[in-house]
A protein has these predicted regions:
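Glycine-rich P-loop/Walker A and Walker A-like loops and their local beta1-loop-alpha1 context
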Residues: 1-69, 86-107, 111, 278-280
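Structural motif
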Residues: 23-27, 191-197, 226-228
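Generic beta-sheet signal
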Residues: 18-24, 186-192, 220-222
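Conserved helicase/translocase P-loop NTPase motor core
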Residues: 151-205
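A short acidic (Asp/Glu
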Residues: 31-35, 199-207, 232-237
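Flexible, charged surface loops at secondary-structure boundaries
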Residues: 13-17, 177-187, 215-218
Length: 280
């Protein structure tokens, strides 16, 4: 889908497909575009200092509502860690809370805990508080959920999650978002900025493959920004999902158009095949 992003100064055109790669050396421009997209679909009110981010986004000349996408953006290692922790408003806490409230077996377990606490408090009131005048102990069942909020995430060896590799953090955050949005019906856009500064080339290939597979079977789409040579994955199926951001923004055309152009304009002594075309 082609997005036309218009602010007071300029109009931009980007293609959003399955697993998008934004390459090129203009990191500032890429960050600005992604921040504009994230702010727009956040539905948050623009503040005075958001002037550069304020925009309107269209597709096929129709204005997209600000709730069209649910956007998740990761900018750093610290953000990857923070969302896997259980804390107020973290993705992990939302996921676990939703599961606790929706799983029958979990609710049965919570009721059993409530029954046991009721017996404990009954004993305390009968044996310890019987001599007090009009005073009893009790508990609020809603406070049981505080136990979950106070839980701690560890790796399978019992170590703090700060021992997880960046690759594991990125993969787990992707899987967490998949679980969170599985039945939401939302169109989901997951953004990883400067992922080439976090992963090796081989690790990035695995994450890109995971993103591609998920975009084929779920409501999730991805944007990865890259600036280091050799990271961008190019094949005849993903050409249109590559955006080059240097002085200008260039969305690559479909593979067959590139092939036809090269055949018409390159010297005839070059042996043209798919492998040569992709590598060059």
């Amino acid at each position: 889908m082609i997005l036309n992003i218009k602010n007071k100064a300029k109009s931009y055109e980007v293609n959003i497909g399955g697993a998008n790669q934004w390459s090129g050396t203009n990191i500032i421009e890429k960050d600005m575009l992604l921040n504009m997209i994230t702010k727009y679909f956040s539905k948050e009110k623009y503040k005075e200092y958001d002037g550069k981010l304020e925009c309107t986004i269209y597709s096929n000349k129709e204005e997209l509502g600000r709730g069209y996408y649910t956007v998740y953006q990761f900018n750093s290692r610290e953000e990857l860690f923070s969302q896997l922790k259980i804390g107020k408003n973290t993705y992990m806490f939302k996921y676990i809370s939703n599961r606790v409230l929706s799983e029958y077996n979990t609710m049965i377990g919570m009721e059993k805990i409530s029954d046991e606490l009721t017996n404990i408090y009954k004993y305390l009131n009968e044996e310890i508080f019987q001599e007090f005048d009009n005073v009893e102990l009790d508990f609020e069942i809603s406070k049981l959920f505080n136990i979950i909020q106070d839980s701690i995430i560890f790796d399978k060896s019992g170590n703090d999650i700060h021992n997880l590799s960046i690759f594991e953090l990125i993969k787990n955050n992707i899987k967490l978002i998949e679980k969170l949005e599985k039945n939401s019906g939302n169109k989901v856009l997951v953004i990883f900025k400067n992922i080439d500064h976090l992963l090796t080339k081989e690790e990035y290939k695995k994450i890109y493959k995971l993103a591609t597979n998920l975009s084929d079977i779920t409501n999730m789409q991805f944007i990865f920004t890259l600036s280091i040579d050799g990271y961008c994955i190019v094949n005849e199926n993903n050409i249109e999902e590559i955006l080059v951001v240097n002085d200008e923004e260039i969305t690559l055309p479909e593979y067959e158009r590139i092939r036809e152009f090269v055949q018409s304009n390159y010297p005839i002594n070059i042996e043209l095949n798919d492998k040569w075309l992709i590598e060059n």
